[in-house]
């Protein structure tokens, strides 16, 4: 009989869901075990910004009541608790986006992702820490302090969604939701030995996802196994009329693909290794782990060839013009007049002065930096030289990928150039921080889908390494087939704690 905290929190989500249905464990027991783990460990890891214990237990009790009555559960994951990145709006919890300017703010509506989680009977444990407004690669830019990596508390968990990844690695939650603007799901997953997926742009609603860069942002699932990630992906995916960027195409059978992949047969699958995403600047242990993963894919029956994506060399420059440009526009709404922080409103100052004081006090250094870069790139006289050119490069990157997929089914690369770096190591060097997104951001520019799946520990420092699997738009099922096959062949890995 499974019942101890140590045993419960280490079970994967699909196992927990089966035990709820079989009445071997209750959702309340599972949720309480996660809450106990959060209480015991989060002073160290700081994965959560807000914990909603009573609300989570109430949602869990509703699932248990349905099980006891013999009724049909609302989803395969009903009763399995989840950690939600604090960039998705929630009516019953604060939504801060890791920023002082939204401290204590409650949204008047739930994000579509939040609504779908609730409808699926998934208890929400709370909101997880993140880089302010999803701007960062380490979760050090949170106004509420950094999250620490459970594998080594002196290292970062990645960003911007380091809180969700750390919660999974620390066994505080079996499921999590993140958002990915340039790698903010996949990169933390790689650094914490968890699984993270950036779905095809437009297939998971952005309604209620507080915008960083609207053409790049995409919500997605995180878990500790590929199958669990697929099950969660299926819950949140689908068209939403309230999101103008939502696509109406049918969601592929990602759960079926994950289950098929567990057989370990990749015969007929063509895999491309991106030449531009390895080599100089990559940690030797990361490259060794990547090469071993490629050899494992070959052993499973896949054919592997090298693929050239020449415009990837310009992806970083294009991304860091497009993203700040959209940031400068999106964050103009935080003006002290409509919601959030208001500073200096004592009747003696003009509206312009109040806005300036509020934004100066409410935004952190990285957010201010990107607003300034974006405003410059969009200004008269520079638009054609910078922003317009970056959009042309974006088109060329998408064409590189389209050409690649004529000869292969998926692409692979390391998910990050190195393992987790030390807290504070890149804090004063924005360019070094930006370079850490090198492997992941091309997919956001193209709107394609990608997954990071653990590929072992680096021989350099015994820290996790992630294998990135990429597929064309609306071919998310390919990620799950290849990812599940690789995961099954790779075998179990040690845990962080």
Curated annotation (Swiss-Prot):
InterPro entries noted in UniProt: Amidase, Amidase_CS, Amidase_dom, AS_sf, GatA
The keyword Calcium appears for this protein: no
Keyword annotations: ATP-binding, Ligase, Nucleotide-binding, Protein biosynthesis
Protein name, entry field: Glutamyl-tRNA(Gln) amidotransferase subunit A
Annotated active site: 85 (charge relay system), 160 (charge relay system), 184 (acyl-ester intermediate)
Binding partners and assembly: Heterotrimer of A, B and C subunits.
Function: Allows the formation of correctly charged Gln-tRNA(Gln) through the transamidation of misacylated Glu-tRNA(Gln) in organisms which lack glutaminyl-tRNA synthetase. The reaction takes place in the presence of glutamine and ATP through an activated gamma-phospho-Glu-tRNA(Gln).
